[in-house]
Amino acid sequence: LNFYGEYYQHSLMPKTFKPADSEAGRPQIFLSATGPLMTTVAAETADGFIMHPFSTESYIRKVNLPLITAGLEAVELERSDYAIDFSPLIATGESDEAIERAIEQVRGRIAFYGSTPGYKMVLDHHGWGDLQEALNRLMKARRTDEMASLIDDEVLAAFAVIGAPDEIGPQLLARYGDIVDRLSIQPEGLSETALGDLLDDLKAVPEA
């Protein structure tokens, strides 16, 4: 390590922890962000950007992407020089009952993320800022079992991709196919066959 900055330095590298040289070269560094300042930092300094799962298509298109574009222009990089990764919230299953269980799990995740003050800006973007405050009150009161009930179908649909396994791929591509370079998906409870078919749906799209 040999970094000496204005405010801090990284220079201690004991031999025990010093990595061997790699033929792969310098590893890429991706940064995750939600708010505008960190999004700009990620665009100007990193090799790629990791979208937070608590993101909607509208927030990504209208907030994150313009900031990423401006950040790349500031350091004279093209969009093709940069990678965007996203792990969207998915509710799917191989039966109606399984889909309903997945939906309730996703409601819980949205409620948990939504209770965080640092993510209020995403809800504010949709005019749902009061929801964050209500979720935060329940979290502080340790009434976490009640939080998911505040996530109505409109909020759910904005944050999550929902449907049978053969409906997920087309929805992901319609929402995010022209935005992201890499999709990380974690649909729980699918058989290997159903998961394989979902991945085939995504891989069938030719690269630009």
What are these model-predicted stretches?
Residues L1-A208:
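Active-site-adjacent structural elements that line small-molecule/cofactor binding pockets in enzymes
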